[in-house]
Regions:
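Helix-coil-helix junctions within alpha-helical repeat/solenoid scaffolds
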Residues: 1-85
Length: 85
């Protein structure tokens, strides 16, 4: 995610809207991508707990979609977050 710090709250609003729309429209893979983007945003804000929470949601959705490559990528990211205290 390539955004300036001043645009983080705007990005958070757009990601939240994307999550609502993808839930409403049953776009599960896109919903997983939304949660992964949200995790990255929280990671940039320094909120590791929320980053982990959203990445875990993305992983579960990717598993439901059978997106093994994305599961693997997100699990590696989650392990990296877990190492940071």
């Amino acid at each position: 995610m390539n955004i300036n710090e001043k645009h983080i709250s705007e990005a958070e609003d757009w990601i939240s809207k994307a999550i609502e729309a993808d839930k409403r429209n049953g776009m599960m893979f896109n919903l997983g991508q939304d949660y992964a983007a949200y995790a990255e945003l929280f990671k940039r804000k320094g909120d590791t707990a929320k980053a982990k929470e959203n990445l875990s949601k993305a992983i579960e959705i990717y598993k439901q979609c059978g997106s093994d490559g994305w599961v693997e990528k997100a699990e590696k990211e989650l392990k990296g977050l877990s190492r940071k205290k």
